[in-house]
């Protein structure tokens, strides 16, 4: 009996330690490096997509891509979910006019520690493009309606 309790306790400890290794994501969301991600196929403007993400889950925003590993993960996630002819998908990067200076920042306020531009253009909102496997960033008109990726 004592051996059974010891083995059961050991299995419980292993289970609890493994369950804490990934983010606890809601159903339909995917986990990477402690964050949760979900691709939404419906088309929205950049502003509407950002607003939608904030309402999905506490702390939600359009995705902020902070490393090449995260870019690979997000690109693969989009490629798995978007099977239509849509060629752009919104990410959380947007040019903001502040005190007569234009700055680029993530919608969640995090700093830009990783960059992966396709080319420089004058449009204000950014997304990823199918021709680059959804890896490279490109400027698009903010009022354009496209699918998007939320992160929490």
UniProtKB/Swiss-Prot annotation:
Expressed by the venom gland. Residues 24-152 form the C-type lectin domain. Keywords: Blood coagulation cascade inhibiting toxin, Calcium, Disulfide bond, Hemostasis impairing toxin, Metal-binding, Platelet aggregation inhibiting toxin, Secreted, Signal, Toxin. The keyword Cell cycle does not apply. One of its GO terms (cellular component) is extracellular region. Heterodimer with subunit B of AaACP or agkisacutacin; disulfide-linked. Belongs to the snaclec family. Anticoagulant protein which binds to the gamma-carboxyglutamic acid-domain regions of factors IX (F9) and factor X (F10) in the presence of calcium with a 1 to 1 stoichiometry. Also inhibits platelet aggregation by binding to platelet glycoprotein Ibalpha (GP1BA) and functioning as a blocker of von Willebrand factor (VWF). Is devoid of hemorrhagic and lethal activities. Possesses antithrombotic and thrombolytic activities. Also hydrolyzes the Aalpha-chain of fibrinogen (FGA). Does not affect the Bbeta-chain (FGB) and the gamma chain (FGG). This is Snaclec agkisacutacin subunit A. It comes from Deinagkistrodon acutus (Hundred-pace snake).
């Amino acid at each position: 009996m004592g051996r059974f309790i010891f083995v059961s306790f050991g299995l419980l400890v292993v289970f609890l330690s493994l369950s804490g290794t990934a983010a606890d994501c809601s159903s339909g969301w995917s986990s990477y490096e402690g964050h949760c991600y979900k691709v939404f196929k419906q088309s929205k403007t950049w502003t509407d997509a950002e607003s939608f993400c904030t309402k999905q889950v506490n702390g939600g925003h359009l995705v902020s891509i902070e490393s090449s590993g995260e870019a690979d993960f997000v690109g693969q996630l989009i490629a798995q979910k978007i099977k239509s002819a849509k060629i752009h998908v919104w990410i959380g990067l947007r040019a903001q006019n502040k005190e007569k200076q234009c700055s680029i920042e993530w919608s969640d306020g995090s700093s830009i520690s990783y960059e992966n531009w396709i080319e420089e253009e004058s449009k204000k909102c950014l997304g990823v493009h199918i021709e680059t496997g959804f890896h490279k960033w490109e400027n698009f008109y903010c009022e354009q309606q496209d699918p998007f990726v939320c992160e929490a």
